[in-house]
Amino acid sequence: MKVSKYIFIKKNIFNLETEKSGEFQLNLLNLDTQALGIPDTDYPTTIKMSSSEFVSLCRDFTNLSDCVKIEVKDEKCTFFVSGKAGNGKYYLKNNNAEKIDDQVIIVNKEDVSCSYGLQYLNSFAKASSLSNIVTLHISSKYPLMIDYEIEDLGFLKFYLAPKMDDDEASNDAEK
């Protein structure tokens, strides 16, 4: 991986009321790898929840384990962690909260159970400052898609392949 000396993004920030300003220049990375295309996918399971709740969930679970198992059955979702320090569960189900930020909407066409690395989820959760809502798109056949809709700007999507158990990895190696 090389850092380009000539290609960069520059951002200036000005606040006229407080007379504060800042300037940032981020060098773009020149990756010497092939681009991995991600096809448009119709995910069978989506979980729409508060992004601050997602951040808290990921942060708390990191103290217990390095991966989280997300299981969705019917319209209920359970996050499981288990490690040397202990174990934990967090339950979500559809609700009709008055505040949109407190609502949980689960759409499930197919029961799903997948494990993901918390190190990566914590990195992706940092985008919660850009949006109050996060949508998790889950499938046993495709990578997890974490979707933040950024008001008036667009969206930010992250993809994360599920973590394979030792049994699954050995079965795949035999094939």
Predicted regions and their residues:
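Short acidic, glycine/tyrosine-flanked loop/strand segments centered on an H-E-D-like triad
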Residues: L28-D32, N95-D101
